A protein has these predicted regions:
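Secondary-structure junction motif
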Residues: 47-48, 62-83, 150-154, 158, ...
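Short beta-strand->loop
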Residues: 28-38, 123-136
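Flexible hinge/capping segments at coil-to-helix
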Residues: 26-64
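Hydrophobic residues within well-ordered alpha-helices
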Residues: 7-8, 58, 101-107, 142
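A late-sequence structural motif
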Residues: 127-170
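Short beta-strand-to-loop elements that line the ligand-binding cleft
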Residues: 18, 86-95, 130
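A ligand-binding cleft/hinge motif common to bilobed small-molecule-binding domains
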Residues: 18-25, 74, 78, 97-126
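Central regulatory/effector-binding core of bacterial HTH transcription factors
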Residues: 1-24, 93
């Protein structure tokens, strides 16, 4: 929400954010890349390994989530509501990169993009909790305000991002 507000006020020429996102009518978005989030737990919760869990079954365990002012929180709030549950985190992290260390410390279960957890997963510090419910895919998006002309640096940066995405998606 902060990046979108800054774009709407003309404080920035573009922003790179994750979905879901509520955009103003003049803003346009370009999908840059999809990503998948996973639910992870630390060694204190090893007893949760080895089977698929329903979200409802996991509500008894502490949950670490981003703050309620973030779109990630809104995403998980909607995910829980769509499964007839209420999102009730026990700990709110300020940034996504804080979730893995909090999970490793045994403070609870946490949702993170898969690539954020890869090192901790490889080291055996955390593991993926298999869910019965499917977490929807999210996207990294470039957002620009169609009502404003971006400066040269912003245009070049957007061109580079789009070019990089095109090359990654080439056969």
């Amino acid at each position: 929400p902060q990046a979108i507000r800054a774009l709407g006020r003309g404080l920035v020429d573009l922003c790179v954010i994750t979905t879901p996102a509520r955009l103003e009518s003049t803003m346009r978005r370009t999908l840059l890349m999809p990503f998948q989030e996973i639910l992870i737990a630390g060694r204190d919760f090893e007893f949760l390994q080895g089977r698929r869990w329903a979200l409802k079954e996991l509500q008894q365990y502490p949950l670490i989530c981003l703050g309620s002012e973030t779109m990630t929180y809104a995403f998980y709030n909607q995910f829980y509501l769509s499964n007839n549950l209420v999102l009730q985190p026990d700990t709110e992290a300020a940034t996504t990169d804080q979730v893995v260390p909090l999970v490793k410390s045994g403070l609870g279960l946490g949702y993170v993009p898969q690539n954020f957890a890869k090192d901790a997963l490889a080291a055996g510090d955390v593991f993926t909790i298999q869910l019965k419910e499917e977490i929807p895919t999210r996207h990294v998006v470039l957002v620009q305000d169609g009502g404003r002309v971006p400066n040269a640096a912003a245009r070049e940066f957007a061109r580079m991002l789009n070019s990089s995405v095109t090359q990654q998606n080439a056969p």
